[in-house]
Amino acid sequence: MPKPIVAIVGRPNVGKSTLFNRIVGARIAIVEDMPGVTRDRLYQDAEWQGREFTLVDTGGLDFAEDIITAQIRKQAELAIYEADIILFVVDAREGLTAIDEEVGRTLRRADKPVILVANKVEHFDKIPYYDFYQLGLGDPVPVSAAEGLNTGDLLDELVKNLPAQDEDPYPPDTIRIAVIGRPNVGKSSLVNTILGEERVIVSNIPGTTRDAIDSSFEKNGKNYVLVDTAGMRRRKKIDLPTERYSVVRALRAVDRCDVALMVFDATEGIAEQDKRIVGYAHEKGKAIILIINKWDLIEKDDKTMNRFEKKIREELAFLDYVPTLYISALTKQRVPKVLETVDFVAEEASKRVATADLNNLIREATQHNPPPADKHRRLKIFYATQGGVKPPTFILFVNEPEIMHFSYQRYLENKIRDTYGFKGTPIRFFLRKREGKDI
């Protein structure tokens, strides 16, 4: 299930970024005594008492009319929209302000769980933070984010208010599919075409975020779930900055999926945001299919597809294992191939290699191309085994893990792929130190 989202909001310069850094344990957000330094949202996974959640740091909510302030306000309101729970930070030293009251009214309208955080309380008995009861948001939790005082109690309260961890409602063999990409590349058309073709939607099960909907269906005896289709299928109902919102939704969907369909607009090419989103799927070990949509709009000759393929491989060189489909969601050209390829890469991601066969392959690979020496030390691989699937994960027992060069690990990966395929799925290696005999 997806991690709950916790948004830190409040007016400028109350210590939101300091609290964010205190919780995640790293100085990621800019901390400066000047309103507006955190103009964009920052996202970081965090954990407390065994509960994982995604923390969002926002720019300060201000209700002035200048352009930058309006942009910050949109970002913060967007974080509120996404969040499962909100940490509303106020400055106990300055006391209650008119902006605090306006933010409080905004949060009450959002109808989300809110924890009121009275920050900058270094001495609990000397700072009167009780005025904040007027906000009607319950008891303020006094903390000093800068000093770390009482932040443990705050996190205890946060964990108590996180959404319950629901059991997985789907059959164990269900393939979860995330359709990701920038706005207006045709994600909604592809989703609607897939669901419209099947006409056997079983259920719409709410996810953790407010409007996340999973659309499940069955085809040829196989169970599928299109993860979080609400943001795509009902976009007209969402009056929010779509470009920024789409990245967050994509990352959350990737966390939950087995197969990521990365959709591009054939008329626009590949943007940095595309690389960021699909790179996240790669890092998370998800099976990936590249979908080049709107292929019907491209003027073609017999070399057009080859030119596109070459460009894609240059721009996304780290995804050389990933299949590409050229489709038109509008005309349904090659759309039936999408689920066929989903089945294929999902099977590849779950494939296992017998230990004896794997060790024979590694032995032949090292004999053909021995590991390079490093300062008179040579890497020796004693034993190999597959430790997991989704993604396929291989454990190599070696004499000196630190001298394994990336290029040689890549060589071993290519040898494994040459023999066993693993098309569409990343491969992971873990090295363990061990004394012993060569395989």
Curated annotation (Swiss-Prot):
Statement: the UniProt record of this protein carries the keyword Cell cycle: no
Organism taxonomic ancestry: Bacteria, Bacillati, Bacillota, Clostridia, Eubacteriales
Function: GTPase that plays an essential role in the late steps of ribosome biogenesis.
Annotated KH-like domain residues: 351-435
Pfam families: KH_dom-like (PF14714), MMR_HSR1 (PF01926)
Residue sites binding GTP 1 per the record: 10-17, 57-61, 119-122
Residues annotated as domain EngA-type G: 4-166, 175-350
The protein, known as: GTPase Der
InterPro entries: G_ENGA, GTP-bd, GTPase_Der, KH_dom-like, KH_dom-like_a/b, P-loop_NTPase, Small_GTP-bd
Quaternary structure and interacting proteins, as annotated: Associates with the 50S ribosomal subunit.
PROSITE patterns in the record: G_ENGA (PS51712)
Listed SUPFAM superfamilies: P-loop containing nucleoside triphosphate hydrolases
Keyword Ion transport on entry: no
Organism listed in the record: Desulforamulus reducens (strain ATCC BAA-1160 / DSM 100696 / MI-1) (Desulfotomaculum reducens)
Gene that this polypeptide is encoded by: der
One Gene Ontology term of the molecular function aspect: GTP binding
PANTHER family xrefs: GTPASE DER
Family: Belongs to the TRAFAC class TrmE-Era-EngA-EngB-Septin-like GTPase superfamily. EngA (Der) GTPase family.
Disulfides per UniProt: none
